[in-house]
Design a protein with these regions (language model features):
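N-terminal cationic and glycine-rich segments that engage phosphates or anionic surfaces
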Residues: 1-101, 105-437
């Protein structure tokens, strides 16, 4: 990777793109330290610390700590991520949007424009909920209409600026800008997580105990990274053969190809969906100061990921079971709406393609579905293992880390994709980076 970057710096165009990307990253990190006017940051920091691991910790990891700092970038890129997921689902549910998506570059530009508007609306709603919900409890130095409006405008504008920076990185930098911003936010929390693990397992312990703890932590991290790489790059290739056709005096066609089915087709979406649904009631109750009691209080505690692996309260582990089931369900659900075996089989039939040993048309569709279901299950199980490890660490050892399975999947996939993009641009210019190794 380092050799690739060094070779990329030898090319003026790529060097400028990389430097532009770094400059935009610096702007985002600086903006993450600028406080929102009229906000009591100490109150929010102490409140957040009392929450422990959970929905807000997950949210803070995606904002790079901007949320706990209550900076102008507190909402960061999260409204855009939510907006993108909503639009992706809507293109399946609404035929007009689906046609727009298939309408080439012009259609994609229209969808991107709609996504921006939805992002601003979501940011506005989230900012208003924060200002009004927490404002009464002490978030605002003075709880009045003016301060509420200032906070709402500042947070909404901050989210819009981060979205704009992400798009500029995509246009003038390297990689997907939104993904780069998200990865930088997650990585910015890494030193804090390492310090927390050091305090929990190594500091004050005997040298031998500290060394063993460090080795175990390192081994777990390496195992997680290996599993994530397998999930990210694992592919089942279905061979496809194309029949030969006679055109004039020549035979054309007859080539071999394949249909790549990724092990983890849905990416981190199942984890995000499952976590969001389970933690949403907790977030709403926190915003409006609702303290659940009795039966409903127990339900809320069961939804909180910080209680799932609590040995002193094993009844809350039912929340972990529900989480695992939801991750597997959403892995199947999301893949079913983004991957259409029937459409693929019909296109193959029109082009004279077939899977060896399988009849074209409906039998091909059934075969793809059968293979896909097995692959999704394997990917969903791997995704679940990566996703629940942080909860186990938190419950059994009290180690609260934001650098969990979801973060790791995002980081690995974005880094690998960015490297591939740099490599492809270098190959165009007869550079081969580490591909020569």
């Amino acid at each position: 990777m380092l050799k690739t970057l060094m070779n990329a710096f030898k090319i003026k165009e790529l060097r400028n793109k990389i430097l532009f990307t770094f400059a935009m990253i610096v702007v985002i990190r600086l903006g993450s330290q600028l406080p929102v006017p009229g906000v009591n940051r100490d109150f929010f920091a102490s409140w957040f610390a009392a929450q422990g691991a959970g929905a807000f910790s997950f949210f803070d990891a995606f904002t790079g700590g901007s949320f706990t700092n209550m900076s102008i970038f507190a909402l960061n890129i999260t409204p855009y991520i939510t907006s993108s997921i909503i639009m992706q689902l809507m293109t399946i549910a609404i035929p007009k949007l689906e046609e727009m998506q298939k309408d080439g570059e012009e259609g994609r530009k229209k969808i991107a424009s709609i996504t921006r508007y939805v992002t601003v609306v979501l940011a506005l709603v989230e900012a208003a909920a924060l200002a009004i919900g927490f404002g009464r409890s002490g978030l605002l130095q003075e709880y009045n209409v003016l301060n509420i409006m200032i906070v709402v405008v500042a947070l909404t504008a901050g989210s819009a600026v981060v979205m704009w920076i992400g798009e500029r990185i995509t246009e003038k930098g390297v990689g997907n800008g939104i993904s780069i911003v998200l990865v930088i936010n997650i990585i910015s929390r890494l030193p804090q997580d390492i310090a927390g693990l050091y305090e929990q397992f190594i500091k004050g312990k005997a040298i031998a105990v500290g060394v063993v703890a460090a080795i175990i932590i390192l081994a777990v991290m390496i195992a997680m990274i290996v599993l994530v790489i397998i999930l990210n790059d694992g592919v089942r290739k279905i061979p496809v053969q194309y029949a030969k056709k006679v055109q004039g005096r020549k035979f054309v066609g007859g080539q071999s190809s394949n249909i790549p089915l990724k092990v983890n087709t849905a990416g981190v979406i199942p984890i995000i969906f499952a976590s969001s649904i389970l933690e949403f009631p907790i977030v709403i109750c926190s915003l409006f100061g609702i303290q659940g009691s009795g039966f409903w209080g127990e339900i809320l505690k069961g939804m909180s990921s910080s209680n799932w692996c609590n040995l002193s309260a094993p009844q809350y582990s039912i929340g972990l079971v529900v989480y695992i089931i939801m991750v597997i369900f959403f892995a199947y659900f999301y893949t079913s709406i983004t991957f259409n075996p029937l459409e693929i089989s019909e296109n193959m039939k029109k082009q004279g393609g077939f899977i060896p040993g399988i009849r074209p048309g409906r039998p091909t569709c059934d075969y793809l579905n059968k293979i896909l279901y097995y692959i999704i299950f394997i990917g969903a199980c791997g995704l679940t293992i990566v996703g629940i490890l942080p909860f186990i660490f938190n419950g059994l050892f009290g180690a609260s880390v934001s650098f969990g399975g979801t973060s790791l999947i995002i980081i690995v996939s974005v880094i690998l994709e960015t490297i591939k993009q740099i490599e492809s641009q270098m190959l165009v210019r007869n550079y081969k980076g580490f591909l020569n190794d």
